[in-house]
């Protein structure tokens, strides 16, 4: 809230006070969002996006430690912490650049291309683990950029596809489904890590 107060200018959007009209009207508004065939693909896509992102974030630290042990190369805690911090920082710029690139273009097509590139990026990243530690770290970094590139574009697509009257409901559903995907991503990756291998006795 503090950045909004500091940087939004002297006047924030002012709307007339509307009396609370009951939970059923809110549910109806959310139901109407489900029927919005233009906005829902972006909302569902955001759920898939956060599923992949939070799954990625949950295994990155353990993955770097594992790679360090596998290649018998010592990586200090400070190096790993700074590496992860840089990953998080560059993700912000990746999302902004991706959103800016979609302006005035065929947004669904571009987001589809972004997802396809990210898919191939994940495969290349996995193969890099067998080649070299530092090459693997490089592709982990690149893969992060590819994951987050469509984040702002998906949110913008949700905002643009609908009327101003139900914008709040669209964004609420966007966040709920998005973070539901994020809540599932980490535990599922953890389950895959801890599940017994076929080679285990």
Range-by-range predicted roles:
Residues 95-106:
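Helix-to-loop junctions at the C-terminal end of transmembrane segments
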């Amino acid at each position: 809230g503090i950045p909004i107060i500091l940087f939004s200018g002297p006047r924030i959007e002012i709307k007339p006070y509307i009396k609370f009209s009951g939970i059923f009207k809110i549910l109806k508004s959310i139901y109407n969002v489900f029927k919005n065939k233009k906005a829902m693909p972006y909302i569902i896509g955001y759920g898939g996006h956060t599923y992949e992102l939070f799954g990625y974030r949950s295994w990155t630290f353990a993955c770097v430690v594992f790679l360090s042990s596998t290649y018998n190369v010592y990586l200090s805690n400070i190096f790993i912490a700074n590496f992860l911090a840089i990953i998080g920082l560059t993700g912000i710029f990746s999302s902004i650049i991706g959103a800016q690139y979609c302006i005035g273009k065929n947004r669904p097509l571009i987001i589809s291309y972004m997802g396809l590139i990210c898919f191939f990026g994940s495969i290349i990243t996995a193969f890099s683990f067998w080649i070299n530690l530092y090459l693997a770290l490089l592709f982990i970094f690149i893969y992060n950029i590819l994951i987050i590139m469509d984040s702002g574009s998906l949110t913008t697509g949700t905002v643009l596809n609908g009327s101003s009257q139900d914008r709040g409901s669209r964004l609420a559903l966007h966040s709920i489904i998005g973070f539901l995907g994020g809540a599932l991503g980490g535990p599922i990756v953890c389950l895959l890590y801890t599940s017994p291998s076929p080679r285990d006795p």
